[in-house]
Amino acid sequence: ALSSAASDVYKRQSLQMSGIMQLERFNLQIFSGEIMGLMALNAHGVSSLVSLLQSNTPVHFGRVYYCEQLVNSHIYSRTTPNEIVVIGQKSHLVNGLTVGDNVFVLSGVERRWLLHTQSFRGRLQELEQAVGVDIPCNRQVEELSLFERCMVELLKAWESGARLVLLWNISHFLAGTDIGRLHYAIRHFASRGMAFIYISNSYEELCGLCDRIAVMYNGSVIKVQEMVSGGSEDIHALLQQFTGTTSSPPRSAMSRGSICLNLSSVSTALLKQVDLAVYSGECLAIHTEDRRLLDGMRRLATGQSALLGGKVLIDGQPIHRPMARDQRVAYIAENPSQMMLFQDMSYLRNLTFCLPRQIDSWFRRRSIYRSLRRELTPELGAVFDKDIRDLNTQEKYALIFRRVLLQQPRVVFFEQPFWGNDVLLQQHIERQVQLLLAKKIAVVVLIVGIYDAFPLAERTLIYKNGHLLTQ
């Protein structure tokens, strides 16, 4: 029997796409007014679940109920989409229209030929006052910040009568203060009966917001944890069980080396008077509430921005050329498994891409290839003859980090290391970074989401409006 308060029920779901089982025996029940956290240990089945929620993708087995109505099963599938809203990095608002048009007209609330914008303004102000925001009704959608856009989508979902809202990795692109304001709005609408599924790979974030947390692995829910006393410890124990890792000792207790990178009053098109000192073997995280500083650091490290003022010193020696051309500096891009590998090159050519030019000799290159195979096969396995396209994500990350190790830099810039990655991949990335730190290579992590704070970081510098706020 289903509870009368049930908003969504997924019973023993099995969903297969392109011959691969995406959801298998998936069981989940969400109640009206509940904030359900969803943490995926790996990414398998998450996108398929979102598609199932919205568009009733045909299933091989099981039943889906929405507002106590059967909407999908292996026998029957409703052709119309469910009134379920997904809020993520991709905008679902219509550019060229105002906030009021999106919230009241496109949501289907107003069906009259003549629309009274004054009434829109009053109703929007009531909603905004309840959740603590102030967005003008006549403001164009393309002028909204990321936080304002998320809030408008949430207000639109409420006005359209949606009973369930899915928020997908919100903390990856919203600043820390904005996350707190969004959580306040979520709690407000939950108190009025709206249900939420909050997808995040940070258990700290989920524990601070959700009533329950569902842990998903390989397309199945393996645990649903009530957020009562002891809940957080149970989640930690489960993570250790699946990852086979224990908590790392605090990096702050480890000895520091000498300063290997020093930015002294550095100015570029996006950076203004930035001072920064990074020690040999140190992991330093730089957190900013907007992407301007992050973009400026990336453009500086990759040589896309010229130095307009100040000095960049490595091991006390100033560099007079772009950092990207200096062998002592390496850069790992956001989503490197897609951005930093050459699909048409062999594994070994990708691996040795950053080595000096003296391996251009065919005989020299073949000797290096044999040596690398012999040294790395026990650690990496039989990956050297694989096509790059056939590598899994963890193998691609291992390839990228071994390439960096072969380059032997003094400092590595790593942008958004956890962006969009599942829990198991995050653990793998941490192990790869530890390889760099063990070689006394400094790692500078650039992050936007406050819950992406890197566990290995000895220090975290928090910037606001381009200025250092705290350390």
Each PLM stretch: what is its role?
Residues A1-Y10:
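Single conserved hydrophobic/aromatic residue that forms the stacking wall/gate
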Residues L206-G208, A453-P455:
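A short, surface-exposed alpha-helical micro-motif characterized by mixed small hydrophobic
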